[in-house]
């Protein structure tokens, strides 16, 4: 039997499909495994390259297989699709993965550590609660508007106004609607408590985690931005340079070029929208406070703002902050502001 060098593993909840290929890419064997058989099967194999789609559970299986001596490559699902031939089935998917993982130019996803996944879970839960609170506030505004009651923008103002509406017996609210509004107010308070818990936990992790502490030496990086950047980028080894990290976050121009004509459009906005928004918010704060400062970064910001305006400067700085963040992670050092010569 030919030596197995590359394996395509199609992940699932209960039934996994494996395609084994030799060094020339020729199919050696294929089989179906139940969940309890996966680790036993790979433990009996010599070290080889295993490709998987970067989907649910991929980071767990990648860590387990790496611990057994294998090289694991996680590939975005959209890149695997180009290699699928024939009908859609799990064996064809696994074969496509084995071919994609053999491409030298394939863009891969870094394997997350449990610590990174913990931070990511914190951010996802907090983000969900924030979205739920925003939706609830908008719904409350719409409902009370049908009774002739309006409120200025802002969660804090609405939070103060609801008790006033409930206590006012002359505003035309029915008894039933008062009970509904009171229930919605209790739900809003519960969401506030959940968001406060997640925010406090993120800030605590930012203070205790040494990597997050280094990231917070960068202008525009607070505990929340530092923790989400670390959870997504890891140690930075998944990218060759800072520009690649910024491109993965979607902070580089989208290109539509042909021949000798180079056309650059707005930023691509690919990758994680949540991380990109935090970098832009942090950059906006830095740009707003750069006037009068004499370090090299602030001077660059002020010159660019004069030429290109505020918003373009914010996005350009967000790109630069992503590159600086990658350098801090990849070189295991803290950011040091440089004075102008």
Predicted regions and their residues:
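A detector of single, family-specific signature residues
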Residues: 1-341
């Amino acid at each position: 039997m030919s030596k197995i060098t590359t394996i395509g593993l199609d992940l699932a909840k209960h039934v996994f499909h494996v395609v084994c290929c030799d060094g020339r890419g020729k199919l050696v064997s294929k089989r179906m495994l139940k969940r309890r058989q996966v680790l036993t099967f790979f433990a009996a194999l010599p070290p080889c390259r295993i490709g998987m789609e970067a989907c649910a559970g991929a980071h767990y299986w990648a860590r387990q297989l790496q611990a057994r001596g294998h090289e694991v490559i996680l590939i975005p699902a959209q890149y695997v699709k180009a290699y699928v031939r024939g009908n859609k089935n799990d064996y064809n998917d696994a074969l496509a993965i084995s071919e994609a993982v053999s491409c030298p130019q394939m863009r891969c996803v870094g394997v997350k550590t449990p610590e990174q996944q913990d931070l990511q879970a914190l951010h996802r839960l907090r983000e969900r609660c924030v979205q739920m609170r925003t939706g609830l506030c908008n719904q409350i505004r719409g409902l009370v508007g049908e009774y002739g009651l309006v409120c200025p923008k802002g969660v804090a103002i609405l939070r103060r106004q609801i008790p006033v509406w409930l206590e006012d017996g002359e505003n035309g609210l029915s008894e039933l609607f008062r009970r509904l509004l009171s229930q919605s107010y209790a739900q809003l308070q519960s969401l506030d408590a959940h968001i406060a818990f997640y925010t406090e936990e993120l800030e605590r992790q930012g203070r205790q985690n040494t990597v997050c502490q280094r990231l917070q030496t960068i202008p525009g990086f607070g505990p929340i931005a530092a923790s989400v950047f670390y959870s997504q980028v890891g140690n930075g080894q998944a990218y060759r340079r800072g520009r690649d990290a910024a491109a993965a976050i979607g902070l580089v121009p989208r290109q539509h070029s042909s021949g000798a004509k180079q056309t650059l459009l707005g930023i691509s906005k690919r990758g994680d929208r949540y991380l990109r928004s935090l970098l832009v918010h942090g950059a906006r704060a830095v740009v707003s406070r750069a006037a009068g400062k004499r370090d090299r970064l602030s001077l660059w910001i002020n010159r660019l703002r004069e030429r290109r305006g505020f918003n373009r400067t914010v996005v350009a700085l967000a790109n630069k902050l992503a590159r600086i963040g990658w350098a801090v992670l990849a070189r295991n050092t803290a950011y040091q502001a440089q004075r102008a010569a």
